[in-house]
Amino acid sequence: MSSYLEYVSCAAGGGSGGVGGDVLGFAPKFCRADARPVALQPAFPLGSGDGAFVSCLPLATARPTPSPPAGPAQSPVPQPAAPRYAPCTLEGAYERGAAPASAAEYGFLGSGPAFDFPGALGRAADEGGAHVHYATSAVFSGGGSFLLSGQVDFAAFGEPGPFPACLKEPADGHPGPFQTVSPAPGACPKPASPTSSLPAAHSTFEWMKVKRNAPKKSKLSEYGATSPPSAIRTNFSTKQLTELEKEFHFNKYLTRARRIEIANCLQLNDTQVKIWFQNRRMKQKKREREGLLATAASVASIKLPRSETSPIKSGRNLGSPSQAQEPS
């Protein structure tokens, strides 16, 4: 309020009957060319030290103070005691006995659907300019306070209001300064998630990935019956296979305690270790059988040419009596 109103103290001293007080002056935008200072007198007499209030509100025509009618002297009617700083509004007469002036004479807005606003800020329904309305009912106190509770149109004084058009009241009835302002989409960039900023190599290493075969799905047979799904085969990692092969090299058969210990070390269960050793023993027996057959075949192929060229067999055949003597 200090940017629009200025308080000028022109008090001359208060106790010796001198008139002292405060002069309330508005900025030039509040007054028209024909504005004249008007003395505002409260409805009750002020005490010592309280001066009159002078305002620069524009008046259409000057109203002379009507003189009281001449008649027989009457005893003054006692007035009820009023508080020292009772509110004195502008809606009544400026001077005692003067007729109340309409709101149009002071350049104030009247009440109507176009200017019916629930808050202190508003605009006309059919106007595009910035019109800020303040209250017309003013309250003055002895200390120089100035309160507003009605509506004043800055557009009536020929200048735009001090507030921009973005603070105008929306059509739904909520005040402009109190409504929630939502930013435009894309105005505030969204922070990237921490998982998206990290590269894929830092989240999972290659050696952590254990390749598993996809489980087989049951297929429909010719008669529409589904075949039972086969058991899922466990894919061991390189580290697990190395440890199992090393253990199999020393022990072909494991005890239950040793099997549980190996399963805990390799993050496997007891059944997986047991089945692996069974399959490994069967593979070893198969290799041995294949190896024995290959060894026997190689030995037979080596001994066969030696038996054909043996001198003993050839001498026996040559020196045999059946072959030496033939019947004549």
UniProtKB/Swiss-Prot annotation:
Protein name: Homeobox protein Hox-D1
UniProt keyword terms in alphabetical order: Developmental protein, DNA-binding, Homeobox, Nucleus, Transcription, Transcription regulation
Biased composition (Polar residues): 307-328
Main localisation: nucleus
Lineage of producing organism: Eukaryota, Metazoa, Chordata, Craniata, Vertebrata
Compartments where located: Nucleus
Motif (Antp-type hexapeptide): 204-209
Record-annotated disulphide pairs: none
Annotation: DNA-binding region: 229-288
SUPFAM superfamilies for the chain: Homeodomain-like
Signal peptide: none
One MF term in the entry's GO annotations: sequence-specific double-stranded DNA binding
PANTHER family per the UniProt record, alphabetical: HOMEOBOX PROTEIN HOX-D1, HOMEOBOX PROTEIN ROUGH-RELATED
Record keyword ATP-binding present: no
Task performed by this protein: Sequence-specific transcription factor which is part of a developmental regulatory system that provides cells with specific positional identities on the anterior-posterior axis. Acts on the anterior body structures.
GO process annotations (BP): embryonic skeletal system development; neuron differentiation; sensory perception of pain
Region annotation Disordered: where it falls in the sequence: 304-328
Family indicated by similarity: Belongs to the Antp homeobox family. Labial subfamily.
Gene Ontology cellular component terms for the protein in this record: nucleoplasm; nucleus
InterPro entries according to UniProt: HD, HD_metazoa, Homeobox_CS, Homeodomain-like_sf, HXA1/B1/D1
